[in-house]
Amino acid sequence: MPMNKDRLYVGLYACGGGDRMPGGEDSDNGNVEGVRYDAKERMTKSSKTKWYFEERRGGVDGNGMLLIRLIVAKVPQPSELIHILRQVPVKQGLPGWNCVAWVKEALEKIEAHGKVLGTHRAEWLDVMDTALWYVEKKKPEHRFDGQGDYDINNVPTYDLMESKETMA
């Protein structure tokens, strides 16, 4: 793949606390340059949580917490993609809603637009299933527990469009 083409990645990050998603989507590393779009949760002064949208340019590794990433699309129209991502709402007080639900909705809105992505494989079930499979594949290789001999600056990357690993 030419390196000068914009790509859409979906990253799976380690998060604190126990698993919260019924399908295990949030169960259980390098500095990647780009822009991170995400729904994040933070505590308020009243000890409640509030969701907010984050758009952050620069390193998107989440302070070393990026477990894996998937290449899901070529992006010939980055400005239109950015516009769509900025419009995906964060939802307060909805039981079970979290950052995984935000990514699902974002991918669905991008797919519905129909003209933002070039070559792609961004259907939610494919993305979710592949992300969970890829993390499970990396666990016995000791990619996340510190026992393996890996450069933490190289995030395991799987190209969903070509069905192959591009960085172990």
Task: Please describe what each predicted stretch is.
Residues 8, 30, 70, 114, ...:
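Residue-level marker of intrinsically disordered, low-complexity segments enriched
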Residues 11, 15, 28, 56, ...:
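Low-complexity, intrinsically disordered/propeptide-like segments
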Residues 1-41:
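N-terminal accessory segments that precede or flank the first globular/catalytic domain
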Residues 7, 12-14, 20, 30, ...:
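Compositionally biased, low-complexity repeat tracts
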Residues 15, 28, 38, 68, ...:
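Intrinsically disordered, low-complexity, compositionally biased regions/tails
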Residues 29-74:
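Cysteine protease-like catalytic core of ubiquitin/ubiquitin-like
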Residues 57-145:
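Active-site nucleophile-His-acid catalytic modules used for acyl/amide transfer and hydrolysis
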Residues 141-168:
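C-terminal helix/juxtamembrane-tail motif
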